[in-house]
């Protein structure tokens, strides 16, 4: 069993805490004037995305999480499973619960990062920016600019978001998957 001692806790490292894989988001070493030094850590549970703040003594250690990340290309879905392919042309399936809300940013042939723990997919991270086609939107009138400068648009993946009035059906747009917001039009 490999372990990290608390003085080796660094941002980005993955550990096992309370029998779950966690990502260290930040760590701060504190040496008080009186008493034992300690490390204040912010952990993100990889299974539930819950953020935890925890303090460890300088003598504590935690097991290293055997977590691996692979960049895979999305192929298709059958409603229950989402299928991806790696560079060796091996097909992998991921349950729709794991894909979750990220399904609205995945279109065929897009790459994404899938995180595995104990040979099971635990999370999917789509590209930060994706290019999607607008399949439905309202027609903007000249008088619409008085009250609002955006309208709702439905994208090829089913996602609905606010776009500027000049975006039309068939337009390709760039979307930020972290915030779910329109970034720019692609010409």
UniProtKB/Swiss-Prot annotation:
This is Elongation factor P. One of its GO terms (cellular component) is cytoplasm. The modification N6-(3,6-diaminohexanoyl)-5-hydroxylysine is found at residue 34. It is found in: Cytoplasm. Keywords: Cytoplasm, Elongation factor, Hydroxylation, Protein biosynthesis. One of its GO terms (molecular function) is translation elongation factor activity. It holds the Pfam family Elong-fact-P_C. SMART domains: EFP, Elong-fact-P_C. Coiled coil: none annotated. Involved in peptide bond synthesis. Alleviates ribosome stalling that occurs when 3 or more consecutive Pro residues or the sequence PPG is present in a protein, possibly by augmenting the peptidyl transferase activity of the ribosome. Modification of Lys-34 is required for alleviation. Pathway: Protein biosynthesis; polypeptide chain elongation. It comes from the Bacteria. The keyword Protein biosynthesis applies. May be beta-lysylated on the epsilon-amino group of Lys-34 by the combined action of EpmA and EpmB, and then hydroxylated on the C5 position of the same residue by EpmC (if this protein is present). Lysylation is critical for the stimulatory effect of EF-P on peptide-bond formation. The lysylation moiety may extend toward the peptidyltransferase center and stabilize the terminal 3-CCA end of the tRNA. Hydroxylation of the C5 position on Lys-34 may allow additional potential stabilizing hydrogen-bond interactions with the P-tRNA. It comes from Buchnera aphidicola subsp. Schizaphis graminum (strain Sg). One of its GO terms (biological process) is peptide biosynthetic process. Its main location: cytoplasm. Gene3D superfamilies: 2.30.30.30, Nucleic acid-binding proteins (2.40.50.140). Belongs to the elongation factor P family.
């Amino acid at each position: 069993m490999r372990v990290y001692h608390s003085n080796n806790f660094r941002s980005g490292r993955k550990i096992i805490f309370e029998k779950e894989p966690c990502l260290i988001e930040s760590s701060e070493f504190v040496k008080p004037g009186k008493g034992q030094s300690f490390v204040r850590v912010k952990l993100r549970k990889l299974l539930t995305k819950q953020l935890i703040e925890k303090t460890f003594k300088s003598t504590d250690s935690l097991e290293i999480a055997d977590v691996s990340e692979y960049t895979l290309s999305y192929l298709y879905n059958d409603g229950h499973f989402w299928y991806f392919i790696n560079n060796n042309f091996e097909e992998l399936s991921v349950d729709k619960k794991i894909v979750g809300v990220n399904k609205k940013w995945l279109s065929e042939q897009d790459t994404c990062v899938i995180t595995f723990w104990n040979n099971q997919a635990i999370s999917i991270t789509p590209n930060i920016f994706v290019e999607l086609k607008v399949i439905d939107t309202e027609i903007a009138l000249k008088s619409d600019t008085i009250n609002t400068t955006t309208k709702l648009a439905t994208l090829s993946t089913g996602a609905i978001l606010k776009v500027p009035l000049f975006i039309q059906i068939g337009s390709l747009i760039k979307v930020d998957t972290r915030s779910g917001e329109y970034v720019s039009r692609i010409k």
